[in-house]
Amino acid sequence: MWSKIRSMMEGHPERLRVMRILIENGLGLRGNEVYLNDIEVPVVRIAKSAGVDRRTVDETIRMVETNPELKSLFSNLRSAGLSLRGVAKQLGLGVVEIVVEDPHKPGIIAGASQLFSEMGVSIRQALVDDPELSPEPKLVLIGDKQVPGEIIPRLLKIPGVTRVSVY
């Protein structure tokens, strides 16, 4: 879907930035309004985040409203909810970010989960970007304690994994 959106926005990089902000933050559209689940978000805040003016956000919303496929997507988009990533350090949790060459390849989550289990780390949260909606999808696993650094080379042996970061 993301490649289709990029194609539709060719020649309008500022509108593409607006759409990216909406998708990455799970912001949906209802009529001419932007929502974070049930909370209305002022378009001026979206504009500031995307580095565009308010009119560009309004134009993008109008364009989405006239395209049935985009309207269906954005009218049903909702935030996935709470992420522990930003507070992991304060809570004594470990964070592992995994990037893969082909996000459609099965077995990445299973392989990573197995390694966490072998190291005695319970997964508190798994966050996976949708490869159809995110231009740079990642898998983020948050463990119940700090994740040992020796997991990195083992994760890199999982077929398809190209980069691993432990925080």
Regions found by a protein language model. Give the residues of each.
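A conserved regulatory-domain signal marking ACT and ACT-like small-molecule sensing domains
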Residues: 2-33, 63-167
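Helix-turn-helix DNA-binding elements, focusing on the entry/boundary residues of the two helices
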Residues: 43
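Active-site/ligand-binding neighborhood in enzyme catalytic cores
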Residues: 60
